[in-house]
Amino acid sequence: MITKPNRNELRKRRHLRVRKKVFGTPERPRLNVFRSLKHIYAQIIDDTKGHTLVHASTLDPELRGIAKGANKQSAKLVGELIAKRALEKGIKDVVFDRGGYIYHGVVKELADAARQAGLNF
């Protein structure tokens, strides 16, 4: 019997393929995006140490009442917030990791908002 592969399993495989090439350094950390059905999460990670330097999501107290759901408006707010927090810590250049998702919709909106707020990638 043929079984249809799970969408999330396929995404995880794509993400592993991408992660072979995308690596965050202390000078240029990795901006990782994860989206669930209800929320959007973004982290800036130094892969040499394995530490998260900055994070933002729709669950943050700053966005809790404003951002509702995992839509484009929420993604834009999360992108602006992660860029603001990164610039406060002195991080300007990052490597974008789309997390195995297609660069479209919510992921693209988050990336564009982070770029407009001052991150370079």
UniProtKB/Swiss-Prot annotation:
Q: Which UniProt keywords apply?
A: Ribonucleoprotein, Ribosomal protein, RNA-binding, rRNA-binding
- Keyword Transferase assigned to the entry: answer is no
Q: Does the keyword Electron transport apply?
A: no
Write out the GO cellular component annotations: cytosolic large ribosomal subunit
Supply one GO molecular-function term: structural constituent of ribosome
Q: Which domain of life is it from?
A: Bacteria
Example GO biological process term? translation
**Entry-linked Pfam families:** Ribosomal_L18p
Q: Which InterPro entries match?
A: Ribosomal_uL18_bac-type, Ribosomal_uL18_bac/euk
Q: Which family does it belong to?
A: Belongs to the universal ribosomal protein uL18 family.
Query: PANTHER family in the record, alphabetically?
Result: 39S RIBOSOMAL PROTEIN L18, MITOCHONDRIAL, LARGE RIBOSOMAL SUBUNIT PROTEIN UL18M
Q: What does this protein do?
A: This is one of the proteins that bind and probably mediate the attachment of the 5S RNA into the large ribosomal subunit, where it forms part of the central protuberance.
For this protein, the record's NCBIfam families field holds: L18_bact (TIGR00060)
**Subunit record text:** Part of the 50S ribosomal subunit; part of the 5S rRNA/L5/L18/L25 subcomplex. Contacts the 5S and 23S rRNAs.
- The protein depicted here goes by the name Large ribosomal subunit protein uL18
Source species:
Thermoanaerobacter pseudethanolicus (strain ATCC 33223 / 39E) (Clostridium thermohydrosulfuricum)
